[in-house]
Amino acid sequence: MQVLRVVLKECGLIKTRVGKLSLTAKGKQLLVDHNELMRTIILFLFRDYNTGWLDSYEDNEVGNLGRLYSLWLLHHYGADWRNTGFYADEYSKAFPMLNAVHGYEYRVFNRLFRFIGLCEINESDDFKGKNWGKEVRKTELLDLMFTFE
């Protein structure tokens, strides 16, 4: 809930007045235009949202830089369950100046893609064991929301 509050506030959709949250004029306007509401939130999440906001990893750029490349990777390779380390390796090839070992997998998949429904993470009882929580696959929503040429 805290992340949602931050996203809505940073998008200018809510404000705090006398300790209470309320909709801004922009927020009220977007309540009737769901497409524009979704566009506003998605643009914020992919351009401005700092996925390192609530963690202790030192490199702030990991997972934030090249976010659309990470989305393309999931789109391209995500039909089947894959270890998140695979995506971190591919990301490291594209951005060798970053230390993607720390934070990338958690920030990208847990803090962004799963947050907006673009991936599933294997946290069900069927996946208990060594790779529990470390394998992901894309959802149908990813292909419905984004196209790549």
What are these regions, as identified by a protein language model?
Residues 34-88:
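Leucine-rich, amphipathic alpha-helical/linker segments
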Residues 13-16, 85-86:
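Helix-boundary capping/turn motifs
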Residues 72-111, 120, 125-130:
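Extended alpha-helical scaffolds
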Residues 24, 28, 53-57, 92, ...:
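A near-ubiquitous, low-amplitude feature marking generic local secondary-structure context
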